[in-house]
């Protein structure tokens, strides 16, 4: 018989920097999970990634105090900002443009994000990424 699930915990943790301090410690502690075990497992799986890159993670907590976790791809906005080489998006996205990315860069981001997107095909995924970029005040060349 399958283990009884007592909850899901969604967090964004910097790659390689999970530690028992908030927000990780309290979120796992409330469910009675072993915080250090999660931190060690997460840091081991993210050591090959760029340090500090926020990684969304979904932790499934079971009734016997065990857990599993699934790591998602980094947020789209982080990838777009990195491609455009900017620190933050525009405070007024439709009037002030702060940078631009090419269609090739949008395709590269879409390829990386494809497992987490609901897009039916690659073209739809690229349009999704382009829309996110436009809402940040970044123009997409080739659209």
UniProtKB/Swiss-Prot annotation:
One biological process term in Gene Ontology: translation
A Pfam family that the UniProt record links to this protein: Ribosomal_L11_N
Domain of life, per lineage: Bacteria
InterPro entries, per the entry: Ribosomal_uL11 (IPR000911), Ribosomal_uL11_bac-typ (IPR006519), Ribosomal_uL11_C (IPR020783), Ribosomal_uL11_C_sf (IPR036769), Ribosomal_uL11_CS (IPR020785), Ribosomal_uL11_N (IPR020784), Ribosomal_uL11_N_sf (IPR036796)
Cellular component GO terms held in the UniProt record: cytosolic large ribosomal subunit
Record PTM: One or more lysine residues are methylated.
Keywords carried by this UniProt record: Methylation, Ribonucleoprotein, Ribosomal protein, RNA-binding, rRNA-binding
Coiled coil: none
The keyword Ribonucleoprotein appears for this protein: yes
GO MF annotation terms: large ribosomal subunit rRNA binding; structural constituent of ribosome
SUPFAM superfamilies per record: Ribosomal L11/L12e N-terminal domain, Ribosomal protein L11, C-terminal domain
HAMAP family: Ribosomal_uL11 (MF_00736)
PANTHER family for this protein: 60S RIBOSOMAL PROTEIN L12, LARGE RIBOSOMAL SUBUNIT PROTEIN UL11M
Quaternary data: Part of the ribosomal stalk of the 50S ribosomal subunit. Interacts with L10 and the large rRNA to form the base of the stalk. L10 forms an elongated spine to which L12 dimers bind in a sequential fashion forming a multimeric L10(L12)X complex.
Entry-linked NCBIfam families: L11_bact
Annotated family: Belongs to the universal ribosomal protein uL11 family.
Function: Forms part of the ribosomal stalk which helps the ribosome interact with GTP-bound translation factors.
Name the record gives this protein: Large ribosomal subunit protein uL11
Record organism: Polynucleobacter necessarius subsp. necessarius (strain STIR1)
Gene symbol of the encoding locus: rplK
């Amino acid at each position: 018989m399958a283990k009884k699930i007592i909850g899901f915990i969604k967090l964004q943790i910097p790659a390689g920097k999970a530690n028992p301090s908030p927000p990780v410690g309290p979120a796992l502690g409330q469910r009675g999970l072993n915080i250090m075990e999660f931190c060690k497992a997460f840091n081991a799986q993210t050591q090959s990634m760029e340090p500090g890159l926020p990684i969304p993670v979904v932790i499934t907590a079971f009734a016997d105090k065990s857990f599993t976790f699934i790591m998602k791809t980094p947020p789209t906005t982080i990838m777009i900002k990195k491609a455009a080489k900017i620190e933050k998006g525009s405070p007024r996205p439709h009037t002030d443009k702060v940078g631009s990315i090419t269609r090739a860069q949008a395709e590269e981001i879409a390829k990386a994000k494809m497992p987490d997107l609901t897009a039916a095909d690659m073209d739809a995924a690229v349009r999704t990424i382009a829309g996110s970029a436009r809402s940040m005040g970044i123009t997409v060349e080739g659209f």
